[in-house]
Every structure is written in structure tokens, then in C-alpha cells.
Swiss-Prot record:
The keyword Metal-binding does not apply. It is an enzyme of class 2 (transferase). Its EC number is 2.7.7.4. It comes from Methylobacterium sp. (strain 4-46). One of its GO terms (molecular function) is ATP binding. The gene is cysD. HAMAP family: Sulf_adenylyltr_sub2. The lineage of its organism: Bacteria, Pseudomonadati, Pseudomonadota, Alphaproteobacteria, Hyphomicrobiales. The keyword Repeat does not apply. Gene3D superfamilies: HUPs. GO terms for biological process: hydrogen sulfide biosynthetic process; sulfate assimilation. Heterodimer composed of CysD, the smaller subunit, and CysN. With CysN forms the ATP sulfurylase (ATPS) that catalyzes the adenylation of sulfate producing adenosine 5'-phosphosulfate (APS) and diphosphate, the first enzymatic step in sulfur assimilation pathway. APS synthesis involves the formation of a high-energy phosphoric-sulfuric acid anhydride bond driven by GTP hydrolysis by CysN coupled to ATP hydrolysis by CysD. This is Sulfate adenylyltransferase subunit 2. It catalyses: sulfate + ATP + H(+) = adenosine 5'-phosphosulfate + diphosphate. Belongs to the PAPS reductase family. CysD subfamily.
């Protein structure tokens, strides 16, 4: 190595692990916006969406976001999630689109009356496809991470979808040296995952470092829950019918992941601060998605959902 190169290497600032992840995510977002015509960010209100939004605001500062946010509202999210969504949209002046499957709404589709598979298909997957078609979005940012679940582990950062929004694992493109192929045929679209290489721990460390607001449900507090099939389900409103002999009890719980409340299990916890959550995450030996009922809809359930157009 020459003296000049050695001097540069010794004096140039070294990026931390979080700084490298941040830079990678911002690069992915900017590249996607530059190479697509009508991008959108899928906003599910959870911790990953909060980090994704924070990164987007950094990526395009000081200007406004060059794309809207899209929330697929199943009408079964926790009340605190919806309140948080509306508050953040107002605080940040976001262009927020909220979409609910009108047919599913008219039919009264829900996780209690129709089960998790039908509810997820109609109110999430079909709703998402409808919204993307309605607004003609050709690229959608999502907050999925590879460490969450097996099918997500093998999906590329830039995921090609057919005109019907289906995912074919065999059509994935190579992404050597962080080079992303954003080309597509007419009618096709892309799902783009800037957080692919982040872990659950990375997310929490970044939230702490950047002081990112998150839904209070992530913090431990006393909440009314019932135990069903090994899961602590929070009784968030009167739509959750109690089974014979079932009585909600107050337990100190928090959520590692958030979805539709009858399909999302809480964990007993004392972690009421970010350092305590980080400590719990370091000690955890189970996936954060252990509380997602939809992941238990049979072997390969998530991969089938993704092939049909799920997030």
C-alpha cells in the first residue's frame, strides 16, 4: 500500500455497524426512486415501518418525501396503532393513503368470524393488490427483514412481481456487490426491502440511537389478555368474543411484533424502556414472529402468502 493510501485509510472515519446499515438502506431508497416512476412506501405502523420512515426522511431531506405512504387497514389493528399512525402523519405532514378492501368490508370479513387465512388473504393480500393497481404504483418499499422468517430470508432486496403481484422465487435476480436490478416489463412491479440486512436487535439499537417514536404497545404495561392456544391475546375492544369460562386478566405484557390484534400474541415482560427491550432482545431465543398466528397457517404458509402477493 502506498504512503498516500495508508494515510487515507488511517485517517478516514470508520463507519459503525449501524452507520453501514443506514447508508445501505438510504442508497437502496434513492436508487429505487431514481429508477422507478411511481414508488410508494408500505406503512404497517410497526417498529420496522417506523425505522423505514425515519430512513426515508433522512434520505430525501430537506425536501418532502417523493412518494406517499400506504397503509392497508384491515379494520382490526390495535387502537393504539391507528392513533399513532394518525398522529405521526399529522406531525410530519405525510401524504398517507389508507386503503381497505371494500368487498371484504361489505362481507364482514374478520379474523374471528372467518379465521386467519381468509382474513389475511382478503383484507391484506387482496387489499394490497387492489391498492397498488388503483394508484398504479410500480415499486413498493417494505420493512421486511431476512432474519424474521424463512421465506423472507431468501428474498432479494429488489423483488420482482408479476402483473398479478405474484412472487416467483425462481425468477429472482442476482445482487452482487450491492448492485440492484430495477428493470421490469410493462405491468410488472417491484417490492423493495431496504431493511433486508437488519436484525431485530439492529432495529432496536437504531430506534434508541435515533430516538424514533414507536407505538407504546412495544413497551411493557398492564393489559387485559386471555390465553388462547398458548398465546396471550389482548382484548382490545368488544369485537373479541370471550369463550366459555374465559375472563380477561391484567398482565404486564408487551408486543415484539404488531398486526391484527386477535392474531398477535403478547409476551410477559418487565421491559418498559428501550435499554430493557434491547436487553430482552439480546437474551431472546425465539423469533419475534412467534406471536403471529398467521405464520402458523400450515407448513410454508408465509411463502405461499408471498407468492400470492402478500407484503
Amino acid at each position: 500500500m502506498s504512503v498516500a493510501l495508508r494515510s487515507f485509510a488511517e485517517t478516514s472515519p470508520r463507519l459503525t455497524h449501524l452507520q453501514r446499515l443506514e447508508a445501505e438502506s438510504i442508497h437502496i431508497m434513492r436508487e429505487t426512486v431514481a429508477e422507478t416512476e411511481n414508488p410508494v412506501m408500505l406503512y404497517s405502523i410497526g417498529k420496522d415501518s417506523s425505522v423505514l420512515l425515519h430512513l426515508a426522511l433522512k434520505a430525501f431531506a430537506p425536501g418532502r418525501l417523493p412518494f406517499p405512504l400506504l397503509h392497508i387497514d384491515t379494520t382490526w389493528k390495535f387502537r393504539e396503532m391507528i392513533a399513532f399512525r394518525d398522529r405521526r402523519a399529522k406531525e410530519l405532514g405525510l401524504d398517507l393513503l389508507v386503503y381497505t378492501n371494500p368487498d371484504g368490508l361489505a362481507r364482514g370479513i374478520g379474523p374471528v368470524s372467518h379465521g386467519s387465512e381468509v382474513h389475511t388473504d382478503v383484507m391484506k393480500t387482496q387489499a394490497l393488490r387492489q391498492a397498488l393497481d388503483k394508484h398504479r404504483f410500480d415499486a413498493a418499499f417494505g420493512g421486511a427483514r431476512r432474519d424474521e422468517e424463512a421465506s423472507r430470508a431468501k428474498e432479494r432486496v429488489v423483488s420482482l412481481r408479476t402483473a398479478q403481484h405474484r412472487w416467483d422465487p425462481k425468477r429472482q435476480r442476482a445482487e452482487p456487490w450491492h448492485l440492484y436490478n430495477l428493470k421490469k416489463r410493462r405491468g410488472e412491479s417491484l417490492r423493495v426491502f431496504p431493511l433486508s440486512n437488519w436484525t431485530e436487535l439492529d432495529i432496536w439499537l437504531y430506534i434508541e440511537r435515533e430516538n424514533i417514536p414507536i407505538v407504546p404497545l412495544y413497551y411493557a404495561a398492564e393489559r387485559p389478555v386471555v390465553r388462547r392456544e398458548g398465546q396471550l391475546i389482548m382484548v382490545d375492544d368488544a369485537r373479541l368474543p370471550l369463550e366459555p369460562g374465559e375472563t380477561p386478566e391484567l398482565r404486564k405484557v408487551r408486543f415484539r411484533t404488531l398486526g391484527c390484534y386477535p392474531l398477535t400474541g403478547a409476551v410477559e415482560s418487565e421491559a418498559a424502556t428501550l435499554p430493557e427491550i434491547i436487553g430482552e432482545t439480546l437474551a431472546a431465543r425465539t423469533s419475534e414472529r412467534q406471536g403471529r398466528v398467521i405464520d402458523k397457517d400450515g407448513a410454508g404458509a408465509m411463502e405461499r402468502k408471498k407468492q400470492e402477493g402478500y407484503f
